[in-house]
Amino acid sequence: MKNKYYPLRSSIDELSTKNDNEIDLEKGPLPEYNSEDGSTLPPYSENLKLKDPKQMGANNPNLFNTDESTTPPDYGEDSLSHRENHSSGTTDNSSPFLIKLLISFIPIFVLNVPAVCYLTYKDALFKDYGKDEWVYFGMWCASCLMIFISLWCFYETWTQAVAQCVKVTAISLAKCVKVISIGLFNIRREMMIIIWILWLIICCILFVYIKSGDLNLNKALIYSTCTISAVLLLIVSSVCIPFWTFERTLAKLAKVFLLQSGIVLVLNGTMFLRGKHFEWTGCEIEASVLFIMGNVLFLCEMECPGALRRMPKSIRNGIASFLGGIANAIRGANDNNDIPLGEMDVESEV
C-alpha cells in the first residue's frame, strides 16, 4: 500500500522556507518538497518512513533521552492532592469570628452612645422607669439585637459597601480640596489684601468699643493686638499662601514680631526709666501704630521677600542721601560766596 502525502504544509515548514539562512551544515541545503507526487519527502523527515515507533529515535539518539536526570520528578499522592485542592485558585478570605463580631457591634455601640449620654445628662438613666418606659427599653434592645444579627450575617456585603462609600467620599473630597486650593492660589494676592482690610476694620471697631467703654479689656491685650492681628492674618492667609512657602511665612512673621517687640520694649522701657507711663490715649495710639506697622511690614515682606533685611541698608542709604544733599547745598552756597567781586560786577554788566 502506497503512502499518500496530502498537500499540507505545516507552520514549521513555512518557517523553514522563509528562513533561507538556516541550513544544517551536516545535511546540506534543504531539498525542495513536491507535495503533489510525494516523491520528495519534507526535509529531514527520515523518521516518518519508519513504521515501528520504537525505531524512530534510532538515527537520532538524543530524540528520546531516557536519562534519569531529565525525567520529571515523581509526584506523590500528597503533592497531587495539594495541587488539586489549590487548582481552583481560591483561598479562605473569611474574617475570624471574633473580628466579625467586634466590627458588627461597633455600629450598635455608636448608635447607643448618644442616647446613653443624653439620659445621663438628664439624670434619667434607669430612674423612675414605669411600665411604658420598660416596654420602650425592651423594644429598643430587641431592635438593636436584630440589627446586630443582620450586620453579623451580612458582614461581607455591608463592609464592602462601607469601604466603597468611604473610598468614593475620600476621592470626591480630595478633588474638591484640590479645586478650591487651585482657585485660592490663583487669587491669593487679592485674598490677602481683602483679609488684611477686613481685619483692620475689625480692629478699628474693637478700638471704638474700648474707647466708648462698652468693652473692657486689659492693657496687655491692647498691647498684643499687633501680635494677634499678625497671627490671625497668618492663619487665615495660610489657605491662600502655598504650603511650600509656609516656612518662609513663619520666618517673616517672626521678623515682624521681633521688630514690634523691640519697639514696645524701647518705648515702655524709656517711659519706665523716666517714671512715667502711657495714658489710655497713649496705649490706643501705640497699639494702633504697632498694628498697622506690623501688618504693612508683614504684607511687604510676603510680597517683596527680604524687605526687612534690606530695610536697615535702605534707611542708611536714605540718611546718607539726605545728608549728602544738605552737604551739597551748603557747599554750593559756600562756592557762591567765594566768587570774587570783580567777576560779580562783570556778570552784572553782561
Swiss-Prot record:
Start-end of Basic and acidic residues biased regions: 11-29
Alphabetical GO biological process terms: meiotic drive
GO CC, any one term: cytoplasm
Entry keyword set: Cytoplasm, Endoplasmic reticulum, Membrane, Toxin, Transmembrane, Transmembrane helix, Vacuole
Transmembrane feature ranges: 97-117, 134-154, 165-185, 190-210, 226-246, 253-273, 280-300
Bias (Polar residues): 57-72
Region (Disordered): 1-92
Family: Belongs to the WTF family.
Described purpose of this protein according to its UniProt entry: Promotes unequal transmission of alleles from the parental zygote to progeny spores by acting as poison/antidote system where the poison and antidote proteins are produced from the same locus; the poison component is trans-acting and targets all spores within an ascus whereas the antidote component is spore-specific, leading to poisoning of all progeny that do not inherit the allele.
Quaternary structure (record): Homomer. Forms protein aggregates. The two isoforms can interact with each other and with themselves. High sequence similarity is required for their interaction.
Listed name of the protein: Meiotic driver wtf30
Taxonomic source organism: Schizosaccharomyces kambucha (Fission yeast)
Gene name of the record: wtf30
